[in-house]
From Swiss-Prot:
Glycosites: N47, N199, N222, N265, N283, N352, N370, N483
Protein name, as recorded: HERV-H_2q24.3 provirus ancestral Env polyprotein
Residue ranges the record marks as coiled coil: none
The protein's role, per its UniProt record: Retroviral envelope proteins mediate receptor recognition and membrane fusion during early infection. Endogenous envelope proteins may have kept, lost or modified their original function during evolution. This endogenous envelope protein has lost its original fusogenic properties but has immunosuppressive properties in vivo. SU mediates receptor recognition.
Residues passing through the membrane, by range: 524-544
Amino acid sequence: MIFAGKAPSNTSTLMKFYSLLLYSLLFSFPFLCHPLPLPSYLHHTINLTHSLLAASNPSLVNNCWLCISLSSSAYTAVPAVQTDWATSPISLHLRTSFNSPHLYPPEELIYFLDRSSKTSPDISHQQAAALLRTYLKNLSPYINSTPPIFGPLTTQTTIPVAAPLCISWQRPTGIPLGNLSPSRCSFTLHLRSPTTNINETIGAFQLHITDKPSINTDKLKNISSNYCLGRHLPCISLHPWLSSPCSSDSPPRPSSCLLIPSPENNSERLLVDTRRFLIHHENRTFPSTQLPHQSPLQPLTAAALAGSLGVWVQDTPFSTPSHLFTLHLQFCLAQGLFFLCGSSTYMCLPANWTGTCTLVFLTPKIQFANGTEELPVPLMTPTQQKRVIPLIPLMVGLGLSASTVALGTGIAGISTSVMTFRSLSNDFSASITDISQTLSVLQAQVDSLAAVVLQNRRGLDLLTAEKGGLCIFLNEECCFYLNQSGLVYDNIKKLKDRAQKLANQASNYAEPPWALSNWMSWVLPIVSPLIPIFLLLLFGPCIFRLVSQFIQNRIQAITNHSIRQMFLLTSPQYHPLPQDLPSA
């Protein structure tokens, strides 16, 4: 635990703390991996936390300790407020797979082509892409071609208060993400898998497409005539059962939606469009037409549509349908928002996911203590500190509770940006590069020193040739140099390759300036395990210190070894020459 932030105003308490800390650093923690100051990437979090405390509790912030855990998995989740469910943007990722790469000739699939496209349907992937362009021509602002990030970002996340809304999909087969406790969900929307297919005709072909999922409406209230009248459908064409063509002659029809029950009787309410999986944040004192236009892709849309969509084609009504391709829909949240499923957080929902999730903001585990408290530094002694400092969770200091979050008045400003992972990855790859360069210089010095020693040895052998050579002249065992520089250079090459790989990955994460809204999907590659990388980044300074100490010890050993060679001292690494003359 590292203590940072605003120090207590009591000077004697502060001096006593620093004295204990200095004593522990000098005598009890010789291998302390982290320096006294906090890592630079946590400075912004500490400053933001202090600002929030100053705004919510001024009497407390003037004399308190802020305590932040440096554990890579210790995070606290703050539930997203009601408006986040209706206004948070989503990025869409598409992937296709084929059972038969060349099932139909290209000329028969020309009906699926978007006429504005210049791509010729010469392979199945382009044929499927042409078909998708027909459906997705109105969704181009929301489609992201970069690979999404899967896998949990954190695995020990706690949520201290109940979230206003959760989404649950319990499939018999799927990718399990985790299940939130019912006590952490004020209301849960249950999704059910489709059991039928729908038919769609395009050109001369009859398509059979997997039907949409459904939402359990048993606990929803039908008040659409009062609150959703005038709410227009978004103009999208994601799927036949989501298509909503718009034109000047035929404006979109108003949608109908159901009320999500709220434990509090207030004017802010959530309504759900169960047909198009949209959440509307309504105020019952104002008509919905006065609210701004909402995005057609929302977190509920992502949860409902994240799956595999099979497409079969049929030449005639009497022929057997043949599988054309499978469309995999995957969605990712915007910066700062995360899906919390059980105790794990995700940026993206994989296709065919299963579990119970909600929207949250992430913050490191931050606590605070009264500035008059004496904070003991744990020493490595047989006795243990019996007195426990009363650390208060940050949410209590900010005045957050389950009711305030459910009402939508909770805080949504504290979040851990994924940019942290990118900067730490850059720093770690730079450290590895510096280590490899240092080892290269040291090995070059060792090779140069060995060449000098061998050259001196040859000179001494020439000077003592009349006496039978240096070894016979000294009447000692002869020593020879065993060159193992090749192994060192191989290890240096591995370090450089690893550093180059990390640098390439970090550069690939950087978002181009023309795609600022999609930079989060570049943060980490798909196959990189996030938790091990984060642990490596956390202990990078410790590894660098140990390697530096190893290099110093190695230099000292090589120097001593070279001196022994120069003064012809014995060494177990050298081999004696035979002293007897060979027999005739």
